[in-house]
């Protein structure tokens, strides 16, 4: 959510920029970066690192070789997973569109880039549908509370923050531990008072929890991308 201003300043200083995805908050800012770089004569490259992963390089090699024949249609599933979703997109930093980006941009930039890279053609038509269907207050189970640590059904809940952070020690690498405190101290404080201790049905999230994207490419190849958080 803070890529635009530093990138513009780097361009003004004459630097070539390797920019982490997503490029910016909206299309206007993206175009502004591209036009500004062109005026200043510098390069801005987007950090789509999966293109250089051996797994995807092999897929690209097979597709380009013609071994599969002519590509007619691609069905791609972006399986986000419950732990990643509840941590990042329900309780965490990417939970609200206005604070960061829509879910498809925040989570599926790499997926869309890989699909364009594989097909080597621009998209000429698209449609997309999605909504926040599940992680809403009206879906909170009976007996639940606003915080997992106070919840009478916490031990039965697949979204338990106590289980995710305290018991399993998952998704905690970015929690700072000040001098004089232990990891247990920090986790218990977060569970009692922080945003990561909230019930997933009582957060202020608004990004979609499922979305489909259909694309028709310039060469008539069709692509279906399904972003699904309810996976492991």
State each model region's role:
Residues 1, 23-24, 77-82:
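Short glycine-enriched loops at secondary-structure junctions
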Residues 4-51, 66:
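Beta-strand-loop-alpha-helix segment that lines the small-molecule cofactor/substrate pocket
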Residues 2, 29, 51, 103, ...:
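Soluble or luminal CAZymes and related metallo-dependent hydrolases
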Residues 50-197:
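Predominantly a Rossmann-like dinucleotide-binding segment in NAD(P)-dependent oxidoreductases
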